[in-house]
Amino acid sequence: MPFGEYPYTIDDKGRVVIPPAFREFVEDGMILTRGMEGCLYVFPLASWRRVEEQLEGLPITDAGSRAFVRFFYSGANKARLDNQSRVSVPQTLRAFAQLDGDVIVAGAPGRLELWNPERWAAAIQAVQQDPPNPELLANFVA
């Protein structure tokens, strides 16, 4: 499972280096898509297959499910690392996540996340100021 956060930059062509700690995780290819809180999710292909199964299991008769699938699935793009361990982020996804210049590459369970540094700082600060529901953390052992 990837963990940690690494500051990188995205070049003028929309390429960002994947940190060495995460390269093996996505070496067989990846799917980039819109994430929550304005970031991008980067799933290795094996994880993406599980995500697809979950999306396919959502009821098409539910408007909220359809909207989420549309948001999440329509933004998906297949990618591979180039010879310099970079991934090319499509312009539509860069615009969605406001990626221009500095980028935070963060690990998360089953995926990586690409963040605008200001959005990343705000997301971290929000958790510090208003921790998640205590019931969600009841079994968390620190």
Curated annotation (Swiss-Prot):
Primary localization class, coarse: cytoplasm
Cystines in this chain: none
A Pfam family the protein falls into: MraZ
Compartments where located: Cytoplasm, Nucleoid
GO BP annotation list: negative regulation of DNA-templated transcription initiation
Annotated Gene Ontology cellular component terms: cytoplasm; nucleoid
Record domain SpoVT-AbrB: where: 5-47, 76-119
Gene Ontology MF terms in the entry: DNA-binding transcription factor activity; transcription cis-regulatory region binding
UniProt KW Lipid metabolism keyword: no
InterPro entries: MraZ (IPR003444), MraZ_C (IPR035644), MraZ_dom (IPR020603), MraZ_N (IPR035642), MraZ_sf (IPR038619), SpoVT-AbrB_dom (IPR007159), SpoVT-AbrB_sf (IPR037914)
Annotated keywords: Cytoplasm, DNA-binding, Repeat, Transcription, Transcription regulation
Protein origin, superkingdom: Bacteria
CDD domains in UniProt: MraZ_C (cd16321), MraZ_N (cd16320)
PROSITE patterns assigned: SPOVT_ABRB (PS51740)
Family stated for the protein in its record: Belongs to the MraZ family.
Subunit structure: Forms oligomers.
Name of the protein described by the UniProt record: Transcriptional regulator MraZ
